[in-house]
From Swiss-Prot:
It is found in: Secreted; Cytoplasm. This is Oocyte-secreted protein 2. Highly expressed in oocytes. GO terms for cellular component: cytoplasm; extracellular region. InterPro entries: PLAC1_fam. Keywords: Cytoplasm, Secreted, Signal. GO terms for biological process: oocyte maturation. The lineage of its organism: Eukaryota, Metazoa, Chordata, Craniata, Vertebrata. Involved in oocyte maturation. Residues 1-17 form the signal peptide. PANTHER family: OOCYTE-SECRETED PROTEIN 2, PLACENTA-SPECIFIC PROTEIN 1. It comes from the Eukaryota.
Length: 158
């Protein structure tokens, strides 16, 4: 997982494509789309090869009840827009091309936004925080020459 926090933008119900459930999440580096392949409207199972992300990217994690498309944001034709100084918007499409010729191909537009600020790099303290007194156990700690010798490597022992 990237250092950036994953931000869930939306849980979408794709009514045009057999009521597939689609979830999208993203970070500064990655975009992840999860699809539950059971169409509720007709009790139809959608196969992994009937779906692709953006410019032909297949599901790269296939489980019985979820397909995951996990790609770098620079892959698959994923587009990046700068919304503000702190926010990026990623845009792509998920395509459904059914094996059954009685169903029309479908396209869903997906968007996900994330913050440019990493939670790992955000300061958690301020200059107004409470300062603790130094520990009395370390304050008068003195090492002897013998202790220092034990901590260093001796050329005679090598």
């Amino acid at each position: 997982m990237a250092l950036e926090v994953l931000m869930l933008l939306a849980v979408l119900i794709w009514t045009g494509a057999e009521n597939l459930h689609v979830k999208i999440s993203c970070s500064l580096d990655w975009l992840m789309v999860s699809v539950i392949p059971v169409a509720e409207s007709r009790n139809l199972y959608i196969f992994a090869d009937e779906l692709h992300l953006g410019m032909g990217c297949p599901a790269n994690r296939i489980h019985t009840y979820v397909y995951e498309f996990i790609y770098l944001v620079r892959d698959c034709g994923i587009r990046t827009r700068v919304v503000s100084e702190e926010t990026l918007l990623f845009q792509t499409e998920l395509y459904f091309t059914p094996r059954n010729i009685d169903h029309d191909p479908q396209e869903i537009h997906l968007e996900c936004s994330t913050s440019r600020k990493s939670v790992w790099l955000t300061p958690v303290s301020t200059e107004n925080e409470i300062k603790l007194d130094p520990s009395p156990f370390i304050a008068d700690f003195q090492t002897t020459a013998e202790e220092l010798g034990l901590l260093s490597s001796s050329p005679n022992l090598l």
